[in-house]
Amino acid sequence: MSFLFLEIMIFGAEENTLRLGVKTKPAIHDDLGIIPLFSWYHESFDKEVDITGVRIPPLEMACKDFHACKWPKGLSIRDQSLALLFDAYNEEIKDHVNEIRSKCEHIITFSHFVPRQELCPEKRMLFYPNLPKVIGSDLLENRIRKIHGKEGNPKACHVFGHTHFCWDAVVDGIRYVQVPLAYPRERKRRMNGGERWLPFCVFSDGKFGDKHSPCYWSDYYAVNPRTPHNMELAPWVSPFYKYRIQR
């Protein structure tokens, strides 16, 4: 696969989305700027200590991307090469971004992947504790800060996805929101998301919508500190690993 073919794969989908009425370019609506951002994850995004004492399936077994995605030579899921490539595509919209920053009072950026690790539960809370290695990008967070400002501001919001954890929190001056529809089986078990939550109004009448409630994980971390060095698996996770004890 060549880089040219990769770009055709990525950007060629735009024609089909336009037919559906889906816009993929930065845009201004009244006083609101909307900026979609390219990104891909990298393993080094995970800065927290790994869970030990149990055998966790390798990423290749747990993540379909390792088998379903084919990349040109020189690009790998195991390093930052893909994250750097996708972030570089954001340079192509920098003129649109500068226009939005100069004209708009409120700005919403959005991405599929996660920009900060604290927007995901700690590893001991996760059915797959190594999930943080395949969810986000530091480059994405840097890009967001270039747009909204290093310190953020009350009129900045970033909408993200991928993990299916409901989240609505302000971190370092920027509001981060994920209100997932989730998979049908997750909705059936009332895990992570559901139709009853949606649609969620992010912006209306010149202001951001009220905080989504209930929002289990961000509500949890609003009152509980993050303790990534805690190796004790959560009660709903430990049964899945009781036969995987490392010896």
Can you annotate each of these PLM segments?
Residues 1-5, 25-26, 41-46, 114-118, ...:
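Active-site environment of divalent metal-dependent phosphoester hydrolases
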Residues 1-33, 122-136:
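Core catalytic region of metal-dependent phosphoesterases/phosphodiesterases
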Residues 3-9, 48-51, 123-126, 172-175, ...:
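Short, glycine/charged-enriched secondary-structure capping and boundary segments
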Residues 15-23, 92-106, 143-158:
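A structural motif corresponding to the C-terminal end of an alpha-helix
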Residues 28, 38, 180:
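Residues at the C-termini of beta-strands that transition into short coil/loop
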Residues 34, 112, 162, 176:
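Divalent metal-coordination and catalytic microenvironments
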Residues 35-108, 113-131, 207-247:
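Active-site-proximal loop/helix segment associated with metal-binding centers of metalloenzymes
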Residues 131-132, 136-155, 163-247:
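Binuclear metal-dependent phosphoesterase catalytic core
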